[in-house]
Amino acid sequence: MTKVSVLVAVYNTADYLPQCLDSLLAQTMTDIEVLCVDDGSTDASPAILQQYVERDQRVKPTFLKENTGLAHARNVALRQATGEYVCFVDSDDWLATDALEKVYDTFEDGVDTVLFRVVLHFTDGREKEYKMKPFETLTGEEAFKESLTWKIHGVYAVGR
């Protein structure tokens, strides 16, 4: 069984998609699958995905004919996932090279969900860290309530 399935919903992000995919394929943890669901993009995103499929068999695309929305695209990818754990990444995100290895190790310690530190990178070169709550263990109900007020959100991974 694959250790981590990375689910990437793609919609008109040709300008960012290569950096996203490069960051996923450069992970120190190599036992991953990258499930990309193109949600009816009208830009070069489908062609970019096809280029990556030819370079690396871990990239597994699905092409939807029309835009059905983020939730549907993620659900399509989730149904295809074979990993022990799943990580949701937007197609304009990129991860540090050891991110998935750290996530996997954290799951092996018995947690249910991992939230990532988020740093926003702007096209003019500025960076801004998204301020989230300091690390703590929350129950599912507490985490849900915190997410409603945007105190926690971002890139995340969950156990299956």
How should each PLM-predicted stretch be described?
Residues 1-160:
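Nucleotide-sugar donor-binding/catalytic module of glycosyltransferases
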